[in-house]
A protein has these predicted regions:
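Conserved beta-loop-beta/alpha segment of the NTase-like Rossmann-fold superfamily
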Residues: 1-74, 100, 109
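Residues at the C-termini of beta-strands that transition into short coil/loop
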Residues: 6, 58-59, 82-85, 141
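Short, catalytically relevant binding-site loops at active-site mouths
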Residues: 62-63, 86-88, 143-145
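A short, charged helix-loop
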Residues: 73-92
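Left-handed beta-helix
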Residues: 77, 100-167
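A short glycine-threonine-serine/GTX helix/turn-capping micro-motif
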Residues: 87-99, 112
């Protein structure tokens, strides 16, 4: 199914746009420029088993100011998310693969546009955290590639070929 977001008003806006189709069903939001070694089947299974309100994928990056980032407490709970921070509190970037229950719709309706004029998914997830909802973080094992640029696509191709060659 293809659902058109009329204007680029943020990922939380995209979630609201899809709400009539999604209804009350849990769902995966997988940004198309992400590539994960091994896929997400194990994470989907964990989401179904543990039933958090949201599951987010994180990975350490050298340039966290270019991503949404997450802070975790000593018990590995999400305490704060910030979209493209000028002064990143951690190096844990949101990968762009999320699993949500219908609670994300209410959270997306409750937030206001960011300084970029968008409804940020990080703000909607933060709303869940702030209201005591369970947001489960998972650190990516294996490689992750954001393929938003040509050089990244070529690197992703090399990573996949290396994986195939190792089999």
């Amino acid at each position: 199914t293809y659902i058109l977001q009329d204007e680029p008003l943020g990922l939380a806006h995209a979630v609201l746009t899809a709400e009539p189709f999604l209804g009350d069903a849990p769902f995966v939001m997988y940004l198309g420029d992400n590539l994960l070694q091994g896929g997400i089947q194990d994470l989907v299974t964990a989401f179904r088993t543990n039933e958090p309100d949201a599951l987010i994928l994180l990975t350490p990056v050298p340039d966290p100011e270019n991503y949404g980032v997450a802070e975790l407490d000593g018990d590995n709970r999400v305490t704060r998310l910030v979209e493209k921070p000028r002064d990143p509190p951690t190096d844990l970037a949101l990968v762009g693969v999320y699993m949500f229950t219908r609670g994300i719709h209410d959270a997306a309706r409750a937030i206001r546009p960011s300084r970029r004029g968008e409804l940020e998914i990080t703000d909607a997830i933060q709303h869940l955290v702030d209201h005591g909802r369970r947001v489960e973080p998972h650190i990516v094992r294996g490689w992750w590639k954001d393929t938003g640029r040509l050089d990244d696509m070529l690197e992703a191709n090399r990573l996949i070929l290396d994986d195939i060659a190792e089999r």
